[in-house]
Swiss-Prot record:
GO terms for biological process: circadian rhythm; neuropeptide signaling pathway. Inhibits Y-organs where molting hormone (ecdysteroid) is secreted. A molting cycle is initiated when MIH secretion diminishes or stops. This is Probable molt-inhibiting hormone. Expressed in the postmolt, intermolt, and premolt stages of the shrimp eyestalks and the brain. Coiled coil: none annotated. GO terms for molecular function: neuropeptide hormone activity. InterPro entries: Crust_neurhormone_CS (IPR018251), Crust_neurohorm (IPR031098), Crust_neurohorm_sf (IPR035957), Hyperglycemic (IPR001166), Hyperglycemic2 (IPR001262). Belongs to the arthropod CHH/MIH/GIH/VIH hormone family. It comes from the Eukaryota. Residues 1-28 form the signal peptide. The lineage of its organism: Eukaryota, Metazoa, Ecdysozoa, Arthropoda, Crustacea. It is found in: Secreted. GO terms for cellular component: extracellular region.
């Protein structure tokens, strides 16, 4: 029976780990790059993202989370989600937070 050298297996494992780390970093930066003002405002970002997460849990629609986050929460889906999460009374606060996450708009 043919045995693969230990060096081959070690190289394969290292490549898989590095690939997984790069993929994870790339997907995280894609999410964060949709909002230019995230850096330094992660606490605000987490509060706004929570609305989209709650909405996704309420409706269970595929892709709803992405539609809610589209254009850094500056869209109609976010407003629908805010209402669905019974947080529409906080609309003014969320508008301020979204403007902080979207500097220059």
């Amino acid at each position: 029976m043919y045995r693969m050298p230990m060096r081959f297996w070690l190289t394969a494992v290292v490549m898989v780990v590095v690939g997984a780390l790069l993929l994870d970093t790339a997907s995280a930066s894609y999410i964060e790059n949709t909002c230019r003002g995230v850096m330094g405002n992660r606490d605000i970002y987490k509060k706004v993202v929570r609305v989209c997460e709650d909405c996704t849990n309420i409706f269970r629609l595929p892709g709803l989370d992405g539609m809610c986050r589209d254009r850094c929460f500056n869209n109609e889906w976010f407003l629908v989600c805010l209402k669905a999460a019974n947080r529409d009374d906080e609309l003014d606060k969320f508008k301020v937070w979204i403007s902080i996450l979207n500097p220059g708009l």
